[in-house]
Amino acid sequence: VGYFVLALFSGIGIFKYKILEINEIYDKDIFSEIKEGLMLVSHDGILLDYNKSAQTVFGWLHEKNKGLPIHFLDSRFSVSAGARNFYINTGHGDEKRIYEFRLTELEGKRKTGGYLYIFLDVTEKMCLIDKLRYMADHDSLTGAFTRGGILAEAKKLLSAYKNKGRIFSLCMIDVDYFKEINDNYGHIAGNRMLCELVEAFSQVLDGKGMLGRYGGEEFLVLIPDAAMEEAAGFAEKLRAGIEAMTVPFGENTLSVTVSVGVVSAGSYPGEEETIDVLVSRADRALYRAKNSGRNRVCVFGEDAL
């Protein structure tokens, strides 16, 4: 709201006094004390004036630079770009701040009288948005992607495969007999085990894949740029790592195993592939791994490893 009111006020004032008589406005304290940053630029990009809030953001805003083209002072500003809303990062030292800008065109007698940059520090707002976005896409218990989050990433990979030919693979993982952990030791133990599993998966993936909690004790792993054989190797490392893992819990030492189903995009040329199709294939491979004795890896269309 502040942006629109300020833009309206400034636009009316500048239209009233004309661009050449704008100093009549600047003599008033209100221009200087407004909390939003204000920077006035001529129609050909010459710095005319600014207020205190603008000067605290950009060190190059001082008297000796008035009359100079702003793109010489800071290449991020261009009145010819036609921008109306944009963000930039700035700050002093390691401190980085994010500013939201609005570029308002001011009317002169016969042509554009100039431009008014209005900007506001939105660092906290953007941090909150990022935090909310992270919370929406990540499981609150384990920190892995949520089901919706990991499927959104899968859609991106599938799009890259269809448009650019970038292969990827998908692993569906189920914790064997996980219910026994909850039944015998309680849900706190079960939650602890899930967190340890995610940590172990992440160490094996080492940034080369994405992990999501698909539901309960089921996980979905995406491995970009990996064909079936490489993905099966990753899956076996995941399985072996979990088999060797122990989790202290009170006076007890807990352990589990996992079953894994693996599928790769493009494994069956000529067939229409969607995320639902790939997940279904991985799930069928997982089902076969569980029916073959659990604690093993099955590749879709092949025998258990």
Question: PLM ranges: what are they?
Answer:
Residues 1-34:
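Interfacial "cap-and-anchor" motif at the non-cytosolic start of specific transmembrane alpha-helices
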Residues 28-30, 126-145, 159:
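Amphipathic HAMP/coiled-coil signal-transducing linker helices
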Residues 111-121:
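PAS-family sensory domains
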Residues 129-130, 228-232, 250, 265-305:
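Catalytic-core segments of nucleotide cyclases and related cyclic-nucleotide turnover enzymes
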Residues 133-152, 173-187, 195:
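Conserved nucleotide-binding and Mg2+-coordinating catalytic segments in signaling enzymes
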Residues 151-185, 201, 212:
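Active-site-proximal structural segments of metal-dependent nucleotidyl cyclase/transferase enzymes
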Residues 189-210, 218, 237, 242:
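Active-site-proximal alpha-helical element of nucleotidyl cyclase-like catalytic domains
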Residues 210-213, 254:
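A short pre-motif secondary-structure segment
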